[in-house]
């Protein structure tokens, strides 16, 4: 890369585009608030209301007499952008002279992957018992085997339906590799023909659920073993907001090299806990 040819806006957009392809946990979140983020510490107010009461009336009893209008409860929550993922790397002039001129572009892609990894880890760990997230629906801690994997996943999805999540609402499960292997062995009718399931960790469909695989599933040792905290959720369960990636090119004073530094601001929060079930499990 020639320093003079560096276009920060283009590189920032390239990073954001790469992030979109790399996200697994962030991919299935509500991201409608991202355009409002300008700086670290920004707060997004996510407006919501409760359900109004609907009363049944029999016309045999005469005309309807309305009571005082109900004040429907406010369910608004705040999402704070309190995280930043950043990078700072350089390529020496000698390396470029030896034919590594495109290495900065490659490093840009690698940096994007690592930023996506940091963001995904943050969202995955919103359900870690140490996260402080309140209102989580925790399924019973379960040892998963070939014999019970399908019944366990079905039971988790049934909890969502019990919370009035519509069967027509898209749901996704994000499994660690070992659990996906058990699922794959137990379920032979996976829909993997569609090329859509080659992106964002998607590996299969099961009913109306999209099955994803990720190494970033939250883990906590319970004193005996590592327990994985699998998310089964709708696209409204977690809100995620981020800024546009920011990049700058510069020449470090201490070396003969071109360097690029950049960051992305973000925040995430469980905003609809009834649309998220957490499965603590182990092999």
Question: In which residue ranges do the predicted regions lie?
Answer:
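Residue-level signal for secondary-structure boundary elements
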Residues: 23, 27, 115, 119, ...
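Sequence/fold signature of self-assembling virion shell proteins
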Residues: 2-30, 35-55, 75-80, 98, ...
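Alpha-helical scaffold segments that mediate packing/assembly in large oligomeric complexes
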Residues: 91-163, 278-283
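Short, structured patches in soluble enzyme cores that scaffold and shape functional sites
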Residues: 93, 175-177, 264
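Extended, solvent-exposed, turn-rich assembly/linker loops in the middle of proteins
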Residues: 132-202
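Generic structural signal of hydrophobic/aromatic residues within well-ordered alpha-helices
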Residues: 10-11, 15, 19-20, 119, ...
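Long, hydrophobic/aromatic-enriched structural stretches that serve as scaffold segments
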Residues: 68-106
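Short Gly/aromatic-enriched secondary-structure transition segments
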Residues: 59-68
């Amino acid at each position: 890369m020639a320093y003079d040819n560096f276009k920060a806006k283009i590189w920032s957009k390239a990073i954001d585009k790469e992030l979109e392809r790399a996200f697994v946990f962030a991919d299935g979140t509500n991201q409608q608030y991202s355009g409002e983020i300008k700086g670290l510490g920004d707060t997004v107010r996510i407006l919501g209301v409760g359900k109004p009461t609907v009363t049944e009336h029999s016309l045999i009893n005469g005309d309807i007499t309305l009571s005082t209008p109900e004040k429907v409860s406010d369910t608004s929550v705040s999402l704070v952008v309190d995280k930043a993922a950043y990078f700072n790397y350089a390529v020496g002039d000698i390396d470029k002279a030896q034919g590594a001129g495109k290495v900065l572009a490659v490093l840009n892609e690698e940096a994007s992957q690592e930023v996506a990894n940091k963001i995904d880890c943050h969202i995955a760990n919103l359900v870690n018992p140490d996260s402080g997230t309140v209102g989580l629906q925790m399924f019973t801690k379960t040892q998963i085997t070939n014999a019970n994997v399908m019944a366990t996943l079905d039971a988790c999805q049934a909890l969502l339906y019990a919370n009035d999540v519509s069967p027509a609402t898209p749901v996704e499960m994000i499994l660690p590799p070992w659990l996906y292997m058990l699922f794959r062995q137990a379920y032979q009718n996976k829909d993997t023909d569609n090329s859509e399931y080659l992106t964002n960790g998607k590996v299969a469909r099961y009913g109306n659920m999209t099955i994803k695989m990720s190494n970033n599933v939250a883990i906590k040792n319970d004193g005996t073993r590592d327990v994985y905290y699998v998310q089964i959720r709708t696209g409204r369960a977690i809100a995620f907001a981020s800024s546009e990636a920011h990049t700058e090119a510069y020449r470090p004073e201490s070396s003969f090299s071109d360097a690029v530094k950049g960051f992305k601001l973000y925040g995430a929060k469980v905003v609809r806990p009834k649309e998220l079930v957490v499965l603590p499990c182990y092999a």
